[in-house]
Amino acid sequence: MKGSNTSRWAIATGIIVVALAAAWYWHSHSSSNEATTQQQRPAGGGRHGMRGGSLAPVQAATAVSKSVPRYLTGLGTVTAANTVTVRSRVDGQLMAIHFQEGQQVKAGDLLAEIDPSQFKVALAQAQGQLAKDKATLANARRDLARYQQLVKTNLVSRQELDTQQSLVSEAQGTIKTDEAAVASAQLQLDWSRITAPIDGRVGLKQVDIGNQISSGDTTGIVVITQTHPIDLVFTLPENEIATVVQAQKTGQPLAVEAWDRTNKAKLSDGTLLSLDNQIDATTGTIKVKARFNNQDDALFPNQFVNARMLVATEENAVVIPTAALQMGNEGNFVWVLNSDNKVSKHLVKPGIQDSQTVVISAGLSAGDRVVTDGIDRLTEGAKVEVVDAHSATTASEKPASREHAKQGANS
């Protein structure tokens, strides 16, 4: 029994010793790893840096001084400078068409012909009547001459002379009527040849050869639209009228550009032609008309386009990317970088602006560097790292990647 107790104590003592040794070994290695980790970890960045001591990556641009044009924009519709519905001025059968649909024609070009037979007959009749009445007049004049001689010898009375004089005058009046009839018949014959009244592009024909047409037809034969030049009618807000009028007082024509619906492609260049004489009370806008040469046929009647009219040019303007301009409780501001790459907030007054750039009227000077990307990570006085677009994207993705890797390891 005694030997058995001794054996139990020996085993228990051994187990205790092994447990103590294991505990010492684990504690010493844990402390060593923690110390190593503390030595390798960089100092925290505080409010001037990001996690792990790295600087916030930003993109920057330098404010530049340049001339900036001021444009007024509006949606407009292209309209033909002149539009004419070509109609026949006489009645008859359409005998020939001398144009191709869609072709450009000049004023005076022959477009169509109506059967001239009836008009030739009418002209011949009028000319025959004129010739007859001219012969009658000649005979009356000869008789008058004889009467004038005979009245001197009292062979004819004074009354007979006066009667003959009246016959001559009557014949002269008849001649004038006949001449007018001849001119009218000639005009009807001329009108059987239908010509273009203006320069322009002909549309689709409205009637085919062989049809009977009349001067009362409202449809006409074809429509001609003058496209060289061509007009653009667009609208501007009524509060811009003073700007346009002031620009017109310089005496220089105001340039107008026509852009497509997406505002990506410029179609043509023209000049301001006129302003309407009244404001549309319903919309609070005024109509403006510009004229374009359109020799390349880039503009087409009834086409919708965006109009841009140059009214002024601001010289030596301070310009920055639009992305740098921010809005806060105090108004518009930008983040400005100093030589140490530390940022500070500057309140600014913006001017002319588009989707790419903005003019800063006050609060910034040419040569100042402004932050254009990474703005949401900035605080006053923070030091940042200026990187290009690719570097900024990579840097912003790294913290998320490390966090994802850490979560994967823990799982």
UniProtKB/Swiss-Prot annotation:
Residues 399-411 have a biased composition (Basic and acidic residues). It comes from Enterobacter sp. (strain 638). HAMAP family: MdtA. It is a peripheral membrane protein. It comes from the Bacteria. Residues 33-58, 389-411 are annotated as: Disordered. This is Multidrug resistance protein MdtA. Keywords: Cell inner membrane, Cell membrane, Membrane, Signal, Transport. GO terms for cellular component: efflux pump complex; plasma membrane. It holds the Pfam family HlyD_D23. Belongs to the membrane fusion protein (MFP) (TC 8.A.1) family. InterPro entries: CusB_D23 (IPR032317), Multidrug-R_MdtA (IPR022824), RND_pump_MFP (IPR006143). Part of a tripartite efflux system composed of MdtA, MdtB and MdtC. It is found in: Cell inner membrane. PANTHER family: MULTIDRUG RESISTANCE PROTEIN MDTA. One of its GO terms (molecular function) is efflux transmembrane transporter activity. Residues 1-21 form the signal peptide.
